[in-house]
């Protein structure tokens, strides 16, 4: 079944870089990233990174593909030049109509308000210390596995409901 094939696109960004670490790479071939591949260095052009990534991904997937977009950031948007919140909200809403699922994970901000401003219902907060960051990734991984387990048995519009709920970590 085509829904059993999983691909990863991973983008690291800051105010000076937009780095596609993985672009539609088979999930089984994606390996842990290194510190050299991901070195945050200030500035969070979150809207620009989201707008560019969603637009690029939209051009590469089929309308019947299940797409899960997870945004992880340690700070508020503060450096975008091409997209604003309204444009991202419209883009997210358009893609949700095509059964894309969005999750937002953030630190050092009002995560619920930021996610809501972009029309993202599934959100998770973490603290930027080693223990909480590791716990956030454990929880996200557990939720992702639960999501993958539902892909073939749950209608696409229901996949986005309660992404971070009911998971034992």
Model-predicted segments: where are they?
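Acidic, low-complexity intrinsically disordered regions
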Residues: 2-169
């Amino acid at each position: 079944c085509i829904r059993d094939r999983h691909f990863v696109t991973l983008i690291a960004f800051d105010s000076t870089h937009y780095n596609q670490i993985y672009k539609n790479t088979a999930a089984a071939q994606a390996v842990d990233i290194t510190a050299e591949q991901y070195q945050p260095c200030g500035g969070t052009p979150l809207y620009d990174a989201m707008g560019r990534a969603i637009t690029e991904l939209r051009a590469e997937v089929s309308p019947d593909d299940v797409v899960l977009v997870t945004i992880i950031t340690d700070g508020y948007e503060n450096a975008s030049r091409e997209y604003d919140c309204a444009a991202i909200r419209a883009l997210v809403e358009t893609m949700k109509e095509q059964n894309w699922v969005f999750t937002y994970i953030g630190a050092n901000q009002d995560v619920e308000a930021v996610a809501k401003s972009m029309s993202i219902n599934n959100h998770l907060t973490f603290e930027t210390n080693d223990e909480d960051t590791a716990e956030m990734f454990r929880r996200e991984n557990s939720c992702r596995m639960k999501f993958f387990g539902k892909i073939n048995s749950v209608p696409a519009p229901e996949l986005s409901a309660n992404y971070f709920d009911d998971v034992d970590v």
